[in-house]
A protein has these predicted regions:
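Charge-rich, low-complexity N-terminal segments
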Residues: 1-82
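Generic hydrophobic secondary-structure signal
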Residues: 26-42, 76, 102-104, 114, ...
Length: 185
């Protein structure tokens, strides 16, 4: 009978051994979950600042290759900063269409974008903001520009400067969009 009690003792010892039960499994996962939560919280950190770019080289390149003189945004108020800039054009010089796009962050950290192209306003509008609907006119400097609503609900201003077409849009205020449009010369 001594052998039977030994088997019962071994069975009882196995049954209550730590780590061999569901509860033991859960307790062994607790440190792992804590480490994962701490890693996730540590990785969040502070939001990364928006980088600023110099649109000067893109402006110069677009003006060089465009068959019509392209204007460019002049000085903007306060803490506006360019955060994106690119030129879309076919290869070779003096070939159309050339489109210069520059994105800005306003003083209120709202986005404003200017698109300058050598195509008529209607073609540039269709190419860059399909589905925009007319929404009256607004004063820009000494002239009036056509106002539109984009599919995202943002205001868009469209006008001409010399022979070039200019579109200004974004989630910035109407006043900021008008300032950006007036700065294009």
């Amino acid at each position: 009978m001594a052998g039977v009690s030994t088997q019962a003792q071994e069975r009882d010892a196995r049954r209550w051994r730590p780590g061999r039960s569901f509860i033991g499994l859960l307790w062994s996962l607790v440190p792992l979950v804590i480490v994962i939560v701490l890693l996730v919280l540590w990785q969040k950190g502070a939001p990364s600042p928006v980088t600023s770019v110099d649109p000067g080289p893109d402006i110069a390149y677009a003006q060089q290759i465009s068959p019509v003189p392209l204007p460019a945004p002049g000085p903007l108020p306060g803490n506006w900063r360019a955060n994106s800039s690119h030129v879309d054009a076919p290869s070779g010089e003096k070939r159309s269409p050339v489109t210069l796009t520059i994105g800005y962050l306003t003083e209120e950290n709202k986005f404003a974008e200017v698109v300058i192209g050598d195509r008529p306003v209607a073609l540039l509008l269709t190419a860059t903001q399909p589905g925009a609907t007319a929404d009256g006119t607004v004063p820009v400097g000494a002239s009036r520009w056509q106002a539109y609503r984009t599919q995202r609900g943002e205001q868009l201003l469209a006008g001409t400067v010399g022979k070039a077409s200019v579109l200004v849009t974004g989630d910035a205020s109407g006043t900021d969009l008008q300032q950006l449009a007036a700065a294009v010369r």
